[in-house]
């Protein structure tokens, strides 16, 4: 064999070796991906699959480089099919759930988890009723999670689960979530006849309950209790509510709205120890909220304490809110992540603070406060701007201002006039329908006049519904530019709501802020960019 032939043969062999190496690399990547996927619990894999396929309307099929995604889906399907005792979420409709029931083992525990039940009619088929009755008879239901805006549909699904004696036909139920988003409240009196010895998670929203007695005698293992009742539901007495809490000493998450908190407390001589509590959320009048707080013995360092106060008046601020916050900070020390303060005027009752009155900022930077308080003033009366400003200033004056790291205001301008003095450690400012021309007035060339209003600690700015034209952004951009040039650039800016922001303005903002986000409503209306900003 001559020299040239040898060289050609060597080149061919080298090419084959390279091809095999590439194939081996692909095989190793596939193996490693599968090994990594196998380490995830099936619940996580199910959520990956659900968010990537089920919840995306624009899912157009797999693209190149989707091998890992296929492995995740395949592994999730194998786990779901072969080990129903580990993964028991079978779909988002009763049809999916019924099909899965027919293929699973008769004794395998199943979960009835139907989020936003997608039905146009308030009834279910006879075969679906049979499936539900069969599982309640076999006592194989571990979780029942139902959310719908149709009262009649929720009633139709729950009816097969109730025994002839009026209670739930299951002793194995560990979690029960019933969210009725219809205007007609859902009666859950069947709890009075139910045996709930294994129940750990109870969440009722948009429901009424005729008797509170049974919850204290039958629930002893609850770790999560969330009750959001409408106005027509009977409010428990303080002894009855405390009895329920005392029967469940391992509570970690407690959330109650005004119609689940007693109005009066005639005997405040003893406290209920809740030493495992991590998150406490209370919403109601100042007397209700602080009356219950005085009766709870909770850990010194909880993950989050959220207080919602409605119909707030000057007397409530000076006599109740301020003293409580000062005592809280004196006895428990500085909150882990500071104090978040939200102020909403009743003029914007259709836009309550967050969902159902809860602070729910869009940016994660606004949601890590360990002590969160939001106050709704003037809900039942029209307040003038001067009256609203007075309430706002009184609230700030009676609050330990050095602890406030998050502040949200809905309309009051006095609150943001001199933030560097009022809230020297403020990190996040949230403005809703506040005229930006008043917050960021016409500036001198270097922007120093408005710069003094905001403390150097400010890192995050959220502006909701600014309703501005292009030229209206100039004061804000000047402020941001001055902060950036002085070495104190904002970490994030979030614009939420319809606004006229052209590409030129968008680019100028992106140049002077580390992270810039615009919500979908604003993007669809005006912005030429898209998800590249996210």
Model-derived regions: residue spans:
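Leucine-rich repeat
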Residues: 1-534
